[in-house]
Each structure stands twice: as C-alpha cells, then as structure tokens.
Amino acid sequence: MPLPQVQFITKEGGCTLCDELFEELESARDYIDFDLEILKIEYDEELYKKYWDKIPVLLVNGKMAVKYRATRDELIKKIGSRSRWKFW
C-alpha cells in the first residue's frame, strides 16, 4: 500500500498558524507514515491564487484535508495511513 502524499502549503516566515500546524504534523509522524512535500505559496502563482487566504493548508493525496488548524490526533485521522503505533 503506497504512503499517503501530504502537501503542506505555507509561506515564508511570519505565519504563526503555519508554525503550529507544522509542529502538529511532525508530531503525527511519530504515529503514521506519509510522504511530505512543503510548498511555499510565494514561489507558485497557482498556489498563491488558490490558497493565499487559507494557509496553512494540507492536501492529502491531492485533496484539501486541513486549513488553518488541526491537532495531532485530527491529523492522524485525516491522513489515515498505515499506522505504526508506539506502545508505551
């Protein structure tokens, strides 16, 4: 089964929501596997037109899954890939 393809759409600096969502996304990586691509809206005119007022945005397999905020647990559910749960 291929890994989910996650695209994190963000911008250069000065985006507190982007920083917070990225931290939650990195935390989710402790529990699920996925491929991550980080895209900056400043460098892609199409992305800028589509998402400038929605960032941060996560696309999962090409579909919008999150905009603005999500917790680690919400991300795990939305990305929903092959789990590799840690046992405490």
Predicted regions mapped to residue ranges:
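Generic recognition of short, well-ordered alpha-helical segments
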Residues: 19-20, 49-50, 70
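Structural micro-motif
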Residues: 49-58
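Local sequence-structure signature of Cys/Sec-based thiol-disulfide redox active-site neighborhoods
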Residues: 1-27
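Small/polar loops that bind or transfer phosphate-bearing groups
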Residues: 10, 39, 67
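Short helix-capping segments at alpha-helix termini
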Residues: 29-33
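Thiol-based oxidoreductase modules, predominantly thioredoxin-like and allied folds used
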Residues: 34-45
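Non-catalytic, surface beta->alpha helical segment in thiol-disulfide oxidoreductase systems
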Residues: 60-88
